[in-house]
């Protein structure tokens, strides 16, 4: 069987900033809401299995629909900012035709669903939205209809959960609202009627969840008052109803309501079972341990998980002897500029617990072997929580660095677990945690990069020794090989001063002094609460979120001042001696490109030609040319001057360009790149066209003749959508053609082969990555080919058959693709 042209090696993502964005199925698959998609992730294998695309707005809630017999789930329900509720039928981790339920007029923020007791083809769905309504839907086979709309006036329902009354087929609905009350509805005469309002919480109710135990129904609720309340619903017998109470007896208050079912009236009582206190901030989620089947009966363990903005997650269980609910385990994150947890989940067998944080990070703990209440942090996927703006491979193709509007720079690399052949990708470091949205970056060396953000300053970072040692352990590359051409006098790590944005280097001597001071007495109270200090780590596996936040920063070695507005684009030549940078501009004087020396960090030259923002720049592989594209729909080509002595810094002069009379593109040019032989360059524009220009190897005497020589060498390729990214592989196809990847505004990535032939049909389309797993759901921001053959982290013999492509997009996602050369 032949290998597919493209397969996904990695997809990095984070979870959306909503309480109900993660749901864990009995098959061990996590459904995670990420941007406009739902990622199906296997935490055991550390791989994204599938991506469900159907929402056109942010996905705010997901829920695996549990079957009545506790068998594996096959359906998933989600709600989003596009006002839709979607039911997904999942078979073998792939989605059949999704069914959408439309009717809400505002954002859907909570969903839940149960199968009716009559048939699994009937699904009862409840959804809450910002339009102050709760809607109930019935899905029969493939048709979905709205049964009822419950209005809450001007109030909002923040969470919903539906179940069945004990010993009956009557559905009961719990709605947690912003009036600090829980509203209970019961189905009567084909309509849901309000039967009880549960008082007790003193702030917005953030989470509600039912659990059935024998003849009792328990409801767990949590709120911003930092408390958890557990309510009990049970059937009242005729004997209990007629029994008179002793006036001197002490008993919890019972709220009694009656339900008619098939001409039989039954009384039910609601009592407050317990109040759990232990969190110090708002509690956003509660989750019961999943029920399971044993000896033909359903067992519901009395274990409850809660997640709070105090950065902790607590596991609660009742004491076996007294029945008093007690805190069994408390886990959480320490340090870092974070805001706590929004949601929590049990694994199906309770061997693992998971929380997702305000900034989208997933935290996974596994129970230690043979130790009941000891939990160990585990490796889990991580990623950006806002648009990923730019990315680059390191020169040796061992890792990828990305920058995002979430104000972080992240480094992703491959990892092979000990004793396994399977390679997975993980976030290995977070070199920069900034105060401005990141925009662009360029690699200056293997362990040095320059980044630009929504500020006027370029910042240069270099890897510390601790990162290189840990990267060596994780990638199984010797430290000596990694440091072959690097400075040996490296700092150990970096830390951020309390009132600064710059990562300050920490050297070995400072760590020793710091540890000595910590052992001694403090001279003042302020010294006890000083800024977080760097702690060197010896890692053999990818770091957890706590370590990424505090111990993987890279020291800032230089700031480059010169631009008048926010940095928008940066590039570095192949020799790593010259940096080119540009900023946002609406005038010619501000659109000038500044060239910097990487040895002296001084300005070398200012190149002025364009009238509007320069969108991208690229040095030719032989360093002879600098290509610039701009919002003004033109490109300019700058040539390094010949005959300059080696001692002096290089200077560039305008070699060729287009203007308003000669430009071929009719809209903004977003992207450009060079072929590996430096003969041709490629431009991509919002006008949906890709053009190859050249031949740049032809001799020319002056700018006029050069501009005449540099002309379109290809036919105009119409991609059908705005082009936002272009990348040419440094490795040729087997037939000698150039391999060109094109990223579109709609999120699709297209692969083409092109060879200069002078004919109309010179483009050959190899593939359009428009499948749910391969494509992005929003704009492709950057594409970047690995500079060498093979797959990073692999040592198999067929490495030469593969090349790798990295992509990032406005959907917060970073993807690594394995491309099979022989199939192109």
Curated annotation (Swiss-Prot):
Pathway field: tRNA modification; 5-methoxycarbonylmethyl-2-thiouridine-tRNA biosynthesis
InterPro entries: Elp2, WD40/YVTN_repeat-like_dom_sf, WD40_repeat_dom_sf, WD40_rpt
Record CDD domains: WD40
Compartments where located: Cytoplasm; Nucleus
Predominant cellular place of this UniProt entry's protein: cytoplasm
GO molecular function: endopeptidase activator activity
One GO-annotated biological process of the protein: transcription elongation by RNA polymerase II
Subunit and partners: Component of the elongator complex.
This protein's domain notes: Folds into a two seven-bladed beta-propeller structure which is required for elongator complex assembly.
Family listed: Belongs to the WD repeat ELP2 family.
Name listed for the protein in its UniProt record: Elongator complex protein 2
Taxonomic lineage from the root: Eukaryota, Metazoa, Chordata, Craniata, Vertebrata
Gene giving rise to this polypeptide: elp2
């Amino acid at each position: 069987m032949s290998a597919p042209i493209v397969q996904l090696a990695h997809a990095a993502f984070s979870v959306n900033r909503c309480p109900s964005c993660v749901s864990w199925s009995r098959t061990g698959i996590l459904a995670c809401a990420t941007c406009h998609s739902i990622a199906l992730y296997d935490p055991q294998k550390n791989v994204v299995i599938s991506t469900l695309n159907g929402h056109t707005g942010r996905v705010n809630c997901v829920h695996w629909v549990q079957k009545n017999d506790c068998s594996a789930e096959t359906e998933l329900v989600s709600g989003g900012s596009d006002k839709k509720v979607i039911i997904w039928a999942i078979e073998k981790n792939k989605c059949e035709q999704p069914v959408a339920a439309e009717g809400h007029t505002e954002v859907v923020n909570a969903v839940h669903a149960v199968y009716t007791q009559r048939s699994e083809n009937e699904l009862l769905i409840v959804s809450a939205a910002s339009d102050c309504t709760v809607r109930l839907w019935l899905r029969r086979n493939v048709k979905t209809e709205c049964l009822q709309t419950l209005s809450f006036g001007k109030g909002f329902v923040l969470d919903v959960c539906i179940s069945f009354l004990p010993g009956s087929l009557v559905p009961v609905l719990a709605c947690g609202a912003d009036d600090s009350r829980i509203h209970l509805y019961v189905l009567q005469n084909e309509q849901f009627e309000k039967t009880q309002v549960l008082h007790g919480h003193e702030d917005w109710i953030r989470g509600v969840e039912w659990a059935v135990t024998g003849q009792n129904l328990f409801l767990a609720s949590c709120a911003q008052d930092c408390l958890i309340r557990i309510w009990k619903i049970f059937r009242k017998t005729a004997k209990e109803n007629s029994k008179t109470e002793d006036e001197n007896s002490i008993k919890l208050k019972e709220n009694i309501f009656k339900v008619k079912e098939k001409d039989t009236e039954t009384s039910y009582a609601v009592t407050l079972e317990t109040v759990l206190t232990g969190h110090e901030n708002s509690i956003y989620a509660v989750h019961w341990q999943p029920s399971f089947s044993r000896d033909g009966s359903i067992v519901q363990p009395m274990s409850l998980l809660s997640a709070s903005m105090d950065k902790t997650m607590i596991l609660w269980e009742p004491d076996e002897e007294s029945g008093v609910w007690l805190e069994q385990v408390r886990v959480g994150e320490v340090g870092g500029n974070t805001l706590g947890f929004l949601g929590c989940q049990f694994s199906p067998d309770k061997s693992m617990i998971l929380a997702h944080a305000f900034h989208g990070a997933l935290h996974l703990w596994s129970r230690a072997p043979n130790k009941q209440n000891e939990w160990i942090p585990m490796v889990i996927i991580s990623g950006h929580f806002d648009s990923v703006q730019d990315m680059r491979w390191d020169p040796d193709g061992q890792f990828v660095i990305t920058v995002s509007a979430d104000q972080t720079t992240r480094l992703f690399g491959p990892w092979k677990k000990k004793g396994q052949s399977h390679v997975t990708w993980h976030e290995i470091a977070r070199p920069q945690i900034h105060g401005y949205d990141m925009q662009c970056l360029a690699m200056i060396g293997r362990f040095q990069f320059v980044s630009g953000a929504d500020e006027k300053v370029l910042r240069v970072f270099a890897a510390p020794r601790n990162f290189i040692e840990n990267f060596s352990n994780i990638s199984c590359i010797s430290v000596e090989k990694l440091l072959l051409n690097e400075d040996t006098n490296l700092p150990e790590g970096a830390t951020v001063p309390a009132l600064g944005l710059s990562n300050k280097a920490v050297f070995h001597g400072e760590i020793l002094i710091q540890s000595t001071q910590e052992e001694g007495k403090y001279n003042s109270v302020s010294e006890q609460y000083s800024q977080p200090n760097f702690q060197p780590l010896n890692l053999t596996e990818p770091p957890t979120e706590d370590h990424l936040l505090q111990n993987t920063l890279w020291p800032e070695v230089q700031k480059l001042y010169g631009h008048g507005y926010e940095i928008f684009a940066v590039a570095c030549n192949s020799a790593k001696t010259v940096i080119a940078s540009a900023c946002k501009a609406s005038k010619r004087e501000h659109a000038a490109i500044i060239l910097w020396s990487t040895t002296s960090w001084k300005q070398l030259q200012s190149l002025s030609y364009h009238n509007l923002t320069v969108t991208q720049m690229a040095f030719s592989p032989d360093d002879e040319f600098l290509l610039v594209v701009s919002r003004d729909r033109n490109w300019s080509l700058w040539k390094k001057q010949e005959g300059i002595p080696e001692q002096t810094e290089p200077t560039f002069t305008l070699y060729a360009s287009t203007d308003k009379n000669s430009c071929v593109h009719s809209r903004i040019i977003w992207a450009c790149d060079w072929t590996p032989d430096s003969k041709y360059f490629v431009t991509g524009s919002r006008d949906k066209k890709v053009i190859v220009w050249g031949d740049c190897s032809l001799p020319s005497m002056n700018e006029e003749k050069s501009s005449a020589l540099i002309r379109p060498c290809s036919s105009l390729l119409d991609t059908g959508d705005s082009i936002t990214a272009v990348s040419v592989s440094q490795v040729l196809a087997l037939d000698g053609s150039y391999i060109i990847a094109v990223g579109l505004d709609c999120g699709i990535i297209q692969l083409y082969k092109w060879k200069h032939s002078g004919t109309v049909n010179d483009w050959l389309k190899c593939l359009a990555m428009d499948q749910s797993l391969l494509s992005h759901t929003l704009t492709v921001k950057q594409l970047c080919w690995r500079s060498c053959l093979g797959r990073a982290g692999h040592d198999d013999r067929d490495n030469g058959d593969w090349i790798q492509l990295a992509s990032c997009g406005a959907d917060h996602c970073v993807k690594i693709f394995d491309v099979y050369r022989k199939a192109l």
